[in-house]
């Protein structure tokens, strides 16, 4: 059971009720609401030095704060830290919140953090005044170290913490990232109003990194190609830009599961690009494809992680929300339930969302069946489905852009920090 984070105490709404009677100028009141709704906005590229490190300095002096820099790297050489020249450093936290944990890749990174804190683990520290090393007995046999991730209910986090005797902590990094990256798009004229859209396609499905740990995207593309759904808005590279491997080589590890996958991909003319787009550019930190999205019944989100026991949603899930669209998520089991825990709504009253509770071995096939059942509908029927989804789409848009989601994340972040040992 996922703990509920659907907090119904939007601080913005409370402030509106308290202060509005005392505001005389309507224009001033509109501006005030605008400013208040952005008071908590975290600049995600400054979250370590402007949010976490000042909090630890003020509330948990003696902690070292580690993270990976620059964004997107997770190798041992990317580990950096903040520390104190005045306080006795007796504990530390490693904020590993940007990327999912892959045990076959990232154990060396975690070992690097242990090495950098060898003095704390041995109960020995350098007296910076005298220059002498001193041994400090640790109260109650306390073992130092926290691992802060953006993976909820994660078997990999449990393994790493058990292996290194770390304590786990969690917050939704990618929720904050999406709020920062997609802020302001509600004040543009790039996104066609929901009520004015004419639906001509079943889905939009951007694909960029498709090999290595992302091969579930190849599985999804396999079903799209095999089931004749290429007429939708789809992109697919001929070479994975991250792994630098051709798609035809990347599908070979999947032959045992899909014996005809090579021939299915060989029949496609790759790469498949969106109009006016080449080389499948990275669009993580901004919205795009506005025209294609406005024509599509739903956005097919192929998340970063789609297997294993964990909840790990990224900014990809929030693209359709910020674009004002319904969505289907190719993610881990329970991804929709996890998202609903943050106050968003999904589309179980519009189409079958039982795929969310399906096991890893069949979830992508269930999603493909859902997409095919929608794809065979008439254009008129797809428009009716989109119109039925409008209430949920508008709720999600408002929750994302009008402070509700941010308020939930802020409470979650502060509650998490309060649980860190002194």
List where the protein language model places each region.
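Short hydrophobic alpha-helical segments enriched in small aliphatic residues
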Residues: 12, 23-25
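Basic polycationic patches enriched in arginine
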Residues: 5, 37-38
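Leucine-biased recognition of intrinsically disordered, low-complexity hydrophobic segments
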Residues: 15-18, 40
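Pol beta-like nucleotidyltransferase catalytic core
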Residues: 40-287, 292-301, 307-314, 318-422
